[in-house]
Amino acid sequence: MAVFRLSELAEQIGATLKGNADLAITSIAALNNAEPTHITFISNAKYRSQLSQSKAGAIIVTAEDVEFCQATQNLLIVKDPYLAYALLAQYMDDLPKSANEISESAVISATAKLGKNVSIGANVVIESGVELADDITIGAGCFIGKNTKIGARSHLWANISVYHNVEIGSDCLIQSSAVIGSDGFGYANDKGRWIKIPQTGGVIIGNRVEIGACTCIDRGALDPTIIEDNVIIDNLCQIAHNVHIGFGTAIAGGVILAGSLKIGRFCQIGGASVINGHMEICDGAIITGMSMIMKPITEKGVYSSGIPAQTNKEWRKTAALTMNIADMNKRLKAIEKQLTE
């Protein structure tokens, strides 16, 4: 178990240290469960009442939080405790490092190009023309299709399928069972018979992109599906063919993006939202969970259409009223007409 001096942690996050600089810290813990060898943080003012009672060895706080702490508590004072927590979590991360070995059970084409310090797990299949840069980890059971390129320091967890002609940038993290580059849902209809359209466009994923478990990103029909740098995508998302996701956008779990949708930079899309295709979402749009977006968004702001939960009795009344809106509107117009005559 690694041990960190409190002064070392303060330096990592640029914090002002109040208390014992030599305190030994072993890990990060939640505010209400932390022990004397733990460091914790507070990022929501409603938990200030717990500060003075915390058993944590040290607490990451803002200057405004200090008055709620005991004088004897060790504090790291920063502007943004949640950001500080994220940085410390990275610094203290004890995730086992890859062994930089290639499993004997891996099947690797003779034409594939492997960089330095590449780790390839059991039963991996790497087809012809694949290029893997330095310090890449490919987890057990992954499939990497023909002519795919993966950038330096990217990490693919187990059982990921990356189809042919896909480009994945540097420092990417892809969680288990994701599928990158499967066919887009493209068909022509001939008198009721569906004619499949080969999807030849591929997928281009930028640098520092994270993709959650079981997320599917379809290849483009002609041009590629594009995920720009610094995008984060949660689990169980469906990214259809020719979608273009802009720099720094965050997409929560269960989101469905229809084909040829273009999403701007720094957008945030809440879980289980559905967005129509062949349109654009402007930079900086925030879409709350369970929203259904059917028209383009042209102005930065917060957009919602999800229905908050009610008791079943209340919901049934609301649903009944909704079903009668057209009739109520017709009756209202008739009354207005009578009043004006």
UniProtKB/Swiss-Prot annotation:
Pfam families, A to Z: Hexapep, LpxD
Active site residues of this protein: H241
Q: What Gene Ontology terms describe where this protein resides (cellular component)? A: membrane
Alphabetic keyword roster: Acyltransferase, Lipid A biosynthesis, Lipid biosynthesis, Lipid metabolism, Repeat, Transferase
Q: What class of enzyme is it?
A: transferase
Q: Does the keyword Mitochondrion apply?
A: no
Catalyses which reaction?
A: a UDP-3-O-[(3R)-3-hydroxyacyl]-alpha-D-glucosamine + a (3R)-hydroxyacyl-[ACP] = a UDP-2-N,3-O-bis[(3R)-3-hydroxyacyl]-alpha-D-glucosamine + holo-[ACP] + H(+)
**What Enzyme Commission number(s) does the record list for this chain?**
2.3.1.191
* Top-rank taxon, per record: Bacteria
Its BP terms in the Gene Ontology are: lipid A biosynthetic process
A single MF term (Gene Ontology): N-acyltransferase activity
Record pathway? Bacterial outer membrane biogenesis; LPS lipid A biosynthesis
Please report which protein family the annotation says this sequence is part of. Belongs to the transferase hexapeptide repeat family. LpxD subfamily.
Q: Whom does it interact with, and what assembly results?
A: Homotrimer.
State what this protein does: Catalyzes the N-acylation of UDP-3-O-acylglucosamine using 3-hydroxyacyl-ACP as the acyl donor. Is involved in the biosynthesis of lipid A, a phosphorylated glycolipid that anchors the lipopolysaccharide to the outer membrane of the cell.
- Protein's name according to its UniProt entry: UDP-3-O-acylglucosamine N-acyltransferase
Query: What organism is this sequence from?
Result: Haemophilus ducreyi (strain 35000HP / ATCC 700724)
- Per the record, the gene is lpxD
